[in-house]
A protein has these predicted regions:
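ADP-ribose/adenylate-binding Rossmann-like module
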Residues: 10-28
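Rossmann-fold dinucleotide-binding core
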Residues: 4, 22-105
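Eukaryotic N-terminal low-complexity, Ser/Thr- and Lys/Arg-rich leader segments
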Residues: 223-231
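Helical "substrate-binding/catalytic lid" subdomain
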Residues: 92-216
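A short helix-coil junction within the Rossmann-fold of NAD(P)-dependent oxidoreductases
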Residues: 11-12, 34-35, 117
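Proline-centered loop/turn at the N-terminus of a beta-strand
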Residues: 16, 41, 60, 182-184
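Amphipathic, non-transmembrane alpha-helical secondary structure
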Residues: 2-9, 71, 170, 207
Length: 231
């Protein structure tokens, strides 16, 4: 964005810019502040589909920024996709987008790892497909069940226990190892479970790992910015 607009920053005043680039919420806020400082109006957008999905009725885009600006441009924006306005904070659209990408990439990576384990045991991706789809299709009911408990800060072990989940993940690590497949993904998952156990959460639900995520590990590696900035 800056590479395009900085050389013409003197003509930005009075214009409306919709930032559909993919970056962090903080970068989106910085972009909004920069544009506002030059007299322009700004909306952040988080497009939830690839280019092939543009113009299709089921596609949508998150938007955030000044409500009056969004309302004035809504009809034009809906030519691209349907719109989902998240709020005044210019970083919210990017935040919802990145949260979605968090779930997408971790979910798809688990699928690819499962396929690798299957292939090592003579099971094709096609043979695994209905079972993979069934497993993924079961997730909404868990999300529905756990959401009110999570919002209440309650993680009772009446349905599941973290210790039980840790044992299950350990079995996955051993199964992966026995198949001769890279174990780094399930080992990373097991490490998170172990941190929860170390925090005394063994008898609580595995959803108590939210509290573990809220306290980053001492060895967390600072993410590289080399490939993340598209503004």
């Amino acid at each position: 964005m800056y590479a395009i607009l900085e050389n013409d920053s003197d003509i930005l005043a009075g214009k409306v810019f919709v930032n559909l680039s993919s970056d962090t919420p903080e970068k989106a806020r910085e972009a909004a502040k920069w544009l506002t400082g030059h007299g322009a109006s700004h909306l952040t957008g988080g497009v939830q589909v690839p280019p092939s999905g543009i113009g299709k009725p089921e596609s949508f885009t998150f938007y955030s920024g000044p409500l009056d600006v969004f309302e004035s441009q809504k009809e034009l924006l809906e030519v691209l996709t349907s719109t989902d306005y998240r709020g005044e904070d210019p970083g919210l659209a990017a935040l919802y987008y990145q949260i979605g990408m968090d779930m997408f990439w971790t979910g798809m990576l688990s699928y690819l790892h499962a396929v690798a384990v299957g292939k090592a045991n003579g099971i094709t991706a096609e043979q695994l497909k209905p079972h993979a789809i069934s497993t993924m299709a079961s997730l909404p009911q868990f999300i529905e069940f756990y959401t009110p408990r999570i919002d209440a800060g309650e993680y009772p072990g009446d349905v599941d226990r973290l210790a039980m989940g840790a044992a299950s993940v350990e079995h996955i690590v051993h199964t992966t190892h026995d198949a001769g497949i890279d174990t780094s993904l399930p080992e990373a998952v097991l490490e998170i479970f172990k941190r929860g156990l170390a925090n005394g959460r063994g008898g609580d639900s595995f959803t108590s790992l939210i509290e573990t995520f809220m306290k980053p590990a001492d060895h967390v590696i600072e993410p590289s910015r080399a490939t993340t900035s598209h503004l």
